[in-house]
From Swiss-Prot:
Source organism per UniProt: Haemophilus influenzae (strain ATCC 51907 / DSM 11121 / KW20 / Rd)
Alphabetical keyword list: Coiled coil, Cytoplasm
The protein's name: Pole-localizer protein TmaR
Cited InterPro entries: DUF496
Gene Ontology cellular-component terms listed: cytosol
Pfam families: DUF496
Length: 114
């Protein structure tokens, strides 16, 4: 019986660890979504700014700088999107492990009662 209790305790600790991991991943994904949204707004801002700047108003290099900034923001959006996909995969894996562990724990308790 002591072996079952020790294993049950280890299972509970592992379950708590996975639950915390899942929550941390969820927070990271929400943070990435905010970053994606912020950078998409910056892209729109720079597009609008680029429409108003004319060559007779300023030098052509300003357009190059703006385009460079826009490309940088687009790259960031892509990077955050990829990171979000990776986090989502980790979260799904943690959920699957938690379900398996919960099922195994229930089976262990069921066998211990016999």
């Amino acid at each position: 019986m002591e072996i079952v209790n020790k294993q049950s305790f280890q299972d509970v600790l592992e379950y708590v660890r996975m639950y915390r991991l899942k929550n941390r991943i969820k927070r990271d994904m929400e943070d990435n979504n905010r970053k994606i949204r912020d950078n998409q707004k910056r892209i729109l801002l720079l597009d609008n700014l680029n429409q108003y700047i004319r060559d007779d108003m300023t030098i052509a290099e300003v357009r190059g700088i703006i385009e460079s900034m826009r490309d940088d923001y687009e790259s960031r959006v892509d990077d955050y999107t990829i990171r979000n996909a990776e986090l989502s995969k980790q979260r799904r894996e943690a959920s699957t492990k938690m379900k398996e562990q919960k099922k195994a724990h229930a089976e262990l308790l069921k066998n211990a009662e016999k």
